[in-house]
Amino acid sequence: MKEPVDCRLSTPAGFSGTVPPPGRTKAARPGTIPVRRSRGSASALPGKIYGWSRRQRDRFAMLLSSFDAALAAYSGVVVSRGTRSLPPSLRLFRAMTRKWLSVTARGNGVEFAIASAKEFSAACRAGWISGTVPDHFFMKWLPEPVRRKSGLWAQLSFIGRSLPEGGDRHEIEALANHKAALSSSFEVPADVLTSLRNYSEDWARRHLAADPDPSLLCEPCTGNSATFERTRREGGFAQSITDLVSSSPTDNLPPLESMPFGPTQGQALPVHVLEVSLSRYHNGSDPKGRVSVVRERGHKVRVVSAMETHELVLGHAARRRLFKGLRRERRLRDTLKGDFEATTKAFVGCAGTVISSDMKSASDLIPLSVASAIVDGLEASGRLLPVEIAGLRACTGPQHLVYPDGSEITTRRGILMGLPTTWAILNLMHLWCWDSADRQYRLEGHPFRATVRSDCRVCGDDLIGVGPDSLLRSYDRNLGLVGMILSPGKHFRSNRRGVFLERLLEFQTRKTVYEHAVIYRKVGHRRVPVDRSHIPVVTRVTVLNTIPLKGLVRASVLGRDDPPVWWAAAVAESSLLSDYPRKKIFAAARTLRPGLSRQFRRLGIPPFLPRELGGAGLVGPSDRVDAPAFHRKAISSLVWGSDATAAYSFIRMWQGFEGHPWKTAASQETDTWFADYKVTRPGKMYPDRYGFLDGESLRTKSTMLNSAVYETFLGPDPDATHYPSLRIVASRLAKVRKDLVNRWPSVKPVGKDLGTILEAFEESKLCTLWVTPYDASGYFDDSLLLMDESVYQRRFRQLVIAGLMREGRMGDLLFPNWLPPSTVVSGFP
């Protein structure tokens, strides 16, 4: 029998706050909830009556919202204020947990209550993995039949990620642990370093091109993340690039051996930026960085570093090369594409135990010797250019860090979070741990042992795999050899369940008998085989439809101010619709924001239509088109109208509100580029032009590229972080809707269901963009480089390099088969 847990004395894991003495605590004893109706009831949200600040009230409200969203998603009904909509089996659970959290927050503090909820969520995740009822006293408030439902455990386990950000105590502890980890040393055996070096060399030879294309260096560096020189508020990386260009000479530069071409003449971006960064790296000391803490949802924090600009530029060059290989790696390919179904199908036929792996502070604990061995192997392969190897050396060597308290250290361990190459190096190290264990498993044991298929999928420090127990033990041992520590509560082994990228997977298996070379033992007068092994083989993998709650409870958008609720809610809900049931999303979203749909409807925006059809983007209860007749007429003109470009009317309207820097100027330049292009429905041909089926993608990429160039020359755009008001959006939408109806005045309102309309809409978007290979002046059209897998992409980049090089070096780089027909290199502008 388990010992009772005294909630007055126990401290939840991850608690951020001060624990009051036992005599002063107001937490309940096990089995009792001494709550006064006037102060701590579930119907009254603790707030001003407890003397809390606005921040404390907001964090506690988010805590309660996470529980309500989880219950709504599980039951599929909207949880109203009176809880009468919930099934009776869940009403008591909701009321009692809210009361317990209220009393605990009043007596022990809001941070203690949040930490308690996170501990409960972790217990639900562990219970779901093991298939046993979670070991937490919250479960006693559920009826026995409901308490044993694994689907409920799975949904409640997502509460932890949706909790508020970490607190002050998390920040202090994280900085101390970060400094201790990066100041420590870890000895790696020499044979392990040799194996890592050989593995990375072999990996590069298999996944990277034998002749590295130097034109990859022509892609611009973009972003607004903080650097050592400038904070994000001061413009970040974009402003630092501007400063770097303006403060550097542009003519008569000395040649650099690491560059495959050069030197450049004039302010030729981005090659000139790369050239200047390489000079600063060779002339400087250890790269410098400023350490800061980013508070993340899930009651935790992350320590990041803002590094020097030239190190980031070199790192981005190396990252682009490594990502070309990672996209070809079968263990990452489907994940990077976002094809989770293909990721799960890969395990069908694998035999053994399911392992879900997650490492603790993985990037901080990688020894520098391990990172250096991986870079040595990549360099030995000859698949990377010298400037890219220089970027890897800069990002994996010692770093001089300055902490918020003014202290400084030079790292002896760790590849920093915030450097471009960190994620790629982490993947290579993780792949070595699995492949080395797999190779060792196949070499050991009986030489006639039957082959057992094993496999894994990797994404940074996350891994899910299926394999025999001996292979998994070798994998864990390899992680220890390279200094990794498994994350407690996130590293699981199970016969039929796993977690990968916060998606819950169930593996259906069948027992299979593998017979080796037969060895018998005598039992009486019989001979009995003794070398048979029974091992489960995966026959099917199912992804649970339990929805993640983090984005629904409160969403954010990278690179911009905190978005208004009406913007973030639509983005979060629509992103879940393709993978999760509509009923669950609607129930959770309307529980959190019951009046948002009415707010849209008052301004004439249909709330439950996708944005590409002129709606707000919220997920509705059904696929019925809930819109007035005038809007349904606009949809008919949008989908079935004769104008080939009309299908993108609403899409372009919403894109106009996205936070790209210098959006107006970039869009105007794109319109100028595309003025001579022709857009038609599939079927019509233009013999003197080249057709691209996804022409709108070309336009979007063109605008984003122009935005990046403007940001590099002009610095960050202060208006790119702001959002329009909802009334401005409604006014713009009304104008687009009116223009669509005027295109086809006699059109009838659409009467089909939403699924049929979206299917027809996808067909109407299939327009061919016909472009000319040369502009009016006879020069090669640079818009062609924007299309993925375009035959002209490589050739155009070679022309860019030719335009940056001195005349005498052009012939050494360019070959006739690289250039479009009748192209004269000397005529390139």
From Swiss-Prot:
Q: Report the top EC class in one word.
A: transferase
E.C. code: 2.7.7.48
Catalysed reaction, written as an equation: RNA(n) + a ribonucleoside 5'-triphosphate = RNA(n+1) + diphosphate
List the subcellular locations.
Answer: Host cytoplasm
Q: Does the keyword Nucleotidyltransferase apply?
A: yes
Q: Which domain of life is it from?
A: Viruses
Q: Which GO terms describe its molecular function?
A: RNA binding; RNA-directed RNA polymerase activity
Q: Which residues form a coiled coil?
A: none
Disordered, as annotated region: 1-39
> Does Methyltransferase appear among the keywords?
no
First-listed, main subcellular location of the protein, grouped into a coarse class: host cell
List UniProt keywords, sorted A-Z: Host cytoplasm, Nucleotidyltransferase, Ribonucleoprotein, RNA-binding, RNA-directed RNA polymerase, Transferase, Viral RNA replication
Cellular component annotations (GO), alphabetically ordered:
host cell cytoplasm; ribonucleoprotein complex
Q: Which InterPro entries match?
A: DNA/RNA_pol_sf (IPR043502)
Q: Explain the purpose of this protein.
A: RNA-directed RNA polymerase that replicates the viral (+) and (-) genome.
The misc remark on file is:
Yeast strains also contain a double-stranded RNA (dsRNA) called W. The (+)-strand of W is identical to the single-stranded 20S RNA. The W dsRNA seems to be a by-product of the viral RNA replication cycle.
On assembly, the entry states: Forms a ribonucleoprotein complex with the 20S RNA, where a single polymerase molecule binds to a single viral RNA genome. Since the viral RNA is not encapsidated, ribonucleoprotein complex formation appears to be the strategy to survive in the host as persistent virus.
Please report the name of this protein according to its UniProt entry. RNA-directed RNA polymerase
